[in-house]
C-alpha cells in the first residue's frame, strides 16, 4: 500500500473560490502584499520565488505561510515592511527577509508571524523547516 508523507500544519478551512468571503486558506503563486485584513489566514505557495510582504505592524495580527511545493523546488520569502523587522531564532532582522531556501525546502515547511506587543517588529511564533535570515 502506498504511503502518503506530509509534514507541516494541518490545513484547516477552505480555499476562496469565486471571490466568496470568509475563507482562511489562500494559494498565492505570485508575489503578494499581505494586508491587516488577512490576519488569521494561511497562505500557501508552490511556485518558485514567491515573496510575501508583511504589512506595517498592527498589534494582534497573525499570518501563516506554508510551502506546498515538492521538496527542493521552492523559495518562500517573508519580507517585512521597510520600517519593521522580524524577530526569529533569538535575534531581530531589521528590514530583512526570512527565506525558506530552495536547497532546504520541504513540502509542508511553514512559518507563523505575529505582531504580539511590539510596534517595531514581527515575531516568529512557530516554524517548521529551515528558514534563513537575509544577510
What is each PLM-predicted segment?
Residues 2-37, 85-88, 124-135:
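Glycine-rich, low-complexity segments
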Residues 3, 14, 31, 40, ...:
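Detector for repetitive beta-architecture
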Residues 38-44:
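Short carbohydrate-recognition loop motifs
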Residues 21-22, 30, 41, 65, ...:
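Short, well-ordered helical secondary-structure segments
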Residues 45-135:
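Acidic, glycine/polar-enriched metal-coordinating patches/loops
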Amino acid at each position: 500500500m502506498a504511503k502518503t508523507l506530509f509534514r507541516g500544519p494541518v490545513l484547516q478551512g477552505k480555499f476562496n473560490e469565486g471571490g466568496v468571503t470568509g475563507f482562511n486558506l489562500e494559494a498565492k503563486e505570485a508575489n503578494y502584499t499581505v494586508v491587516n485584513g488577512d490576519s488569521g489566514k494561511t497562505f500557501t505557495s508552490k511556485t518558485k520565488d514567491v515573496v510575501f510582504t508583511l504589512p506595517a505592524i498592527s498589534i494582534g495580527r497573525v499570518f501563516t505561510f506554508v510551502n506546498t511545493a515538492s521538496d527542493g523546488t521552492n523559495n518562500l520569502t517573508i519580507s517585512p515592511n521597510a520600517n519593521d523587522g522580524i524577530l526569529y531564532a533569538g535575534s531581530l532582522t531589521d528590514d530583512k527577509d526570512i527565506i525558506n531556501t530552495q536547497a532546504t525546502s520541504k513540502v509542508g515547511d511553514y512559518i507563523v508571524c505575529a505582531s504580539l506587543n511590539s510596534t517595531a517588529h514581527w515575531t516568529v511564533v512557530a516554524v517548521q523547516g529551515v528558514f534563513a535570515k537575509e544577510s
